[in-house]
From Swiss-Prot:
GO BP field: defense response to bacterium; defense response to fungus; killing of cells of another organism
Organism encoding this protein: Penaeus setiferus
Sites of Lysine amide modification: K71
GO molecular function: chitin binding
Top-level taxon in the UniProt lineage: Eukaryota
Signal peptide coordinates: 1-21
GO cellular component, one term: cytoplasm
Positions of post-translational Pyrrolidone carboxylic acid modification: Q22
Disulfide bond residue pairs: C45-C59, C48-C66, C60-C67
The protein's name in its UniProt record: Penaeidin-2d
Record keywords: Amidation, Antibiotic, Antimicrobial, Chitin-binding, Disulfide bond, Fungicide, Pyrrolidone carboxylic acid, Signal
Compartments where found: Cytoplasmic granule
Role of this protein: Antibacterial and antifungal activity. Presents chitin-binding activity.
Keyword Membrane attributed: no
Length: 72
């Protein structure tokens, strides 16, 4: 009987943890800011740097100036 109660408790705890991870708002890795020694290359590259990875890739394909910020 104690084993069943323990297993039910562990299963419910696991479900609560999974639900919290799904609603936690985690959006992926935080992008690194550009190094301080390098001056900003312009408003277009700065805007590309703040976009999602897929949008940055699209921006780099059309505006080749942003690609080196993504590779860092």
């Amino acid at each position: 009987m104690r084993l069943v109660v323990c297993l039910v408790f562990l299963a419910s705890f696991a479900l609560v943890c999974q639900g919290g991870a799904q609603r936690g708002g985690f959006t992926g890795p935080i992008p690194r800011p550009p190094p301080h020694g390098r001056p900003p290359l312009g408003p277009i590259c700065n805007a590309c740097y703040r976009l999602s990875f897929s949008d940055v890739r699209i921006c780099c394909n059309f505006l080749g100036k942003c690609c080196h910020l993504v590779k860092g």
